[in-house]
Amino acid sequence: LSGHVPRVVEPIEPFDKGSIDYDVLAYLIQLYGSAQGQRLHQDLRQKALDTASTLKPAQIRDASEAVLICYGDSLQRGGDRPLQVLGEFAQEYLDGVISGIHILPFFPSSSDDGFAVVDYRQVRSDLGDWTDIKDLSQHFDLMVDLVINHCSRENLWFTDYVTNQAPGKDYFHELAGVPDLTQVLRPRNSPLHTEIHTRRGVKKVWTTFSDDQVDLNFANPQVLLEFADILFFYARMGARYIRLDAI
């Protein structure tokens, strides 16, 4: 893609070919067109710069390091917050043994073991809160899941879609016509699309993983910006690594 930008547009800012900035701009222009791609690049670049100033310096990692993967409620103790218990256990028994902890989705969710996210910016109240996440990040490098293929039907974005309200009314993939889906293979037996009664009539939406998980439409640049905001929010809350789910 390094040769893509000059053929399409002269960038607003000059970037060295081969730089991350240049490559990101090239991708955005290819996906969203010249004008929209440049606007998105400026917005995303500023969000990244604003967040970078709050982060710890990067460290070099190698294959000798280990990361613990667990759910937020894997460890429990009486009425204590499970995330607090996890942090105390890890500090007492795993300090020097592991460098990081991957906590599987700890957000409010309606199904699929946390992968049908209802609210991306909240911690499940039965697990703890963002204070517990930040405390863990002071001692271990945290990995957080960003579920970007789909969200829960209980997410407020989908309520917007059903009621034809901004911003969510344009956030989801609708099925146009009757495409041939016979060649689609996936480890699920639920329908690829689901009929939804909306204020605009009955619509079919893509539901790749289940009828409770509606596919998000990244052809809408506002969806990209929304998830960039969420990603940088996770970084500010202490996430060191982001796992992109269902890519």
What name fits each language-model region?
Residues 101, 242-244:
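Hydrophobic residues within beta-strands of alpha/beta enzymes
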